[in-house]
């Protein structure tokens, strides 16, 4: 029965994505992080911000777990059908496959129309780097990198934790991931208060990122891209990133499409030097964005099928 709930959550994400007008736990988690960060910055200063960052992590993830568990508990007390609906809905909100694909397609269409200014604004909504000076090719690369990375932490990781611990654990993972996306930067403003969140996100994504690489390789073979290069580049360039995890899915995609990703970018006006991922020399355009979206859907479906099969065998 629980497997049916997980399947329903996955299908809902495939069909609906994340409608902007719907209530969403991740939005609430983001607001909680903003509120806690403001309060902690008023109390702690200097080196003590490292301790504040630890508190921020514990409070955010802890409150997410407690509140989501209580909502499920309360719904079960009211009616079983309500419990099922809440269970499925909470699981669905942790998955970002269709939402990610929609955002990438918007950028793809805008680039195809030649509206570079609008494409810069759109890509700025899904990446952390500065986008006001990006070329069309750089926008395409930024989009591809984000789709590749979020195949891991926006789909495969929440699926992984959903199958292990239900929507409560999946939402706790999303809290970790949201913390990293909001405060896990290495610049002067966030280095201290975001240190714990960044490290814990690295730990939480350690297994899912490597699974994402494997599923993307399989997807590359299925889609008749360069599956062999996807395997090789993912392994060869796995350390070519400031994160210990991101280069795995990015390398798999770079190899599959025969392109080069990564390199030096600007974040909040500061230049961050990164090595490149991949060795392909062909120009990158909106065509490669479309191919990356195909990889996203295929790898995510493979992940769900494999996780569901393992769940059936064990339970």
Swiss-Prot record:
Q: Which residues cross the membrane?
A: 54-74, 78-98, 152-172, 203-223, 295-315
Q: How would you describe this protein's topology in the membrane?
A: Multi-pass membrane protein
Q: In which pathway does it act?
A: Cofactor biosynthesis; adenosylcobalamin biosynthesis
Q: Name its cellular compartments.
A: Cell membrane
Task: Name one process (GO BP) from the record.
Answer: cobalamin biosynthetic process
Cite the entry's keywords alphabetically.
Cell membrane, Cobalamin biosynthesis, Membrane, Transmembrane, Transmembrane helix
Gene Ontology CC: plasma membrane
> What one GO molecular function would you report for this record?
threonine-phosphate decarboxylase activity
Among Pfam families, the record links this protein to: CobD_Cbib (PF03186)
Q: Which family does it belong to?
A: Belongs to the CobD/CbiB family.
Q: What does this protein do?
A: Converts cobyric acid to cobinamide by the addition of aminopropanol on the F carboxylic group.
This chain belongs to the protein called Cobalamin biosynthesis protein CobD
Instruction: List the lineage, top down.
Output: Bacteria, Bacillati, Bacillota, Bacilli, Bacillales
